[in-house]
């Protein structure tokens, strides 16, 4: 180990995220002055098996959501453990923090403290190596730009409207490159705004920059998006595919063991009936991906869904897998889902995130790298998506700087990669 790449100083602070809530930011400085900074995101609809975000619980500050304890853990305990360690040895750095925490869910030091440090160390190491982060993590083979899943209509927990599913997304698969895909998405976003205005519907945007109009049903949300795609001059299916994030744990009634769809007149569905409901949507509309179609504990339902649609469309586990190796391997063995959503703060360290991506790839599951509803200007996930050739990224709509920052970083990466950059479009769903 060269003395130069040793960690000299770690400094954390409390900053504000895109929802006005506090979050953790960490700065790491190495002996040679190399510097890395990372800010941690936070979710609205959280899986019950996620790593724990440490919040202060002091109602006098930020309604109990302060993160001064997590900040102190970084500045004192984590700094003590990591000072003098080699920043180039990411696995060791992360393992030292995990050992010091000692819990299964990072509840002692806080996943926000550990993750902020983990990402900042990687950034400082990349700076030291004179490499962009995607190249430092992914080596010379990192060159695939992800197909963006753009969340242009919000419902569920992300919006105050009558739509059950949390996200309705567009995927610009007909584009030649990322830059063109981003433009297509932006044009559809703008034409959706005018379609909604024409129907005298609200065009204010939600947490992730999508519209949250008060539509009468889930199907109506799909229909207005199809209108917007055509109005923008594109063809559904050929140019743009659709994706849903049902976030069904949010409308699952545990006591009745039923799924209650408010937008469908509070109709109750069994797991099998909900699977049929999805199959019907997929047969009618150009839907290529459904995330969290069933509750995170409804493994039987997930099995049904996978048997029925697993060869046709991408079935993404988010709350189901929570970016966790144990959960994912259970899914792989049970033949459940065929894709995993990757959220760095669900697992809470860079090396564990990369291990989950690796395991998914080996099992021929696709990877979707994702933001959270509470974001910052941090663009690490853009680099992780390219570093791992994940093929897909989910980072919100075409408005709000907390979302756009990620897209703009991908534009810069694509430009830097030049002719070696790859954008796979429909081919990204290689396992269907």
UniProtKB/Swiss-Prot annotation:
Pfam families associated with the record: Enolase_C (PF00113), Enolase_N (PF03952)
Catalytic activity, EC: 4.2.1.11
UniProt binding sites for (2R)-2-phosphoglycerate: 166, 343, 372-373, 394
Requisite cofactors: Mg(2+)
Membrane-traversing stretches: none
Annotated active site: 208, 343
Keyword Transmembrane in record: no
Key word ATP-binding present: no
Catalytic activity of the protein: (2R)-2-phosphoglycerate = phosphoenolpyruvate + H2O
Pathway: Carbohydrate degradation; glycolysis; pyruvate from D-glyceraldehyde 3-phosphate: step 4/5
Entry's cofactor comment: Binds a second Mg(2+) ion via substrate during catalysis.
Subcellular location: Cytoplasm; Secreted; Cell surface
Family, similarity comment: Belongs to the enolase family.
Role according to the record: Catalyzes the reversible conversion of 2-phosphoglycerate (2-PG) into phosphoenolpyruvate (PEP). It is essential for the degradation of carbohydrates via glycolysis.
The protein's name: Enolase
Species of the source: Leptospira borgpetersenii serovar Hardjo-bovis (strain JB197)
Lineage, broadest ranks: Bacteria, Pseudomonadati, Spirochaetota, Spirochaetia, Leptospirales
Annotated gene: eno
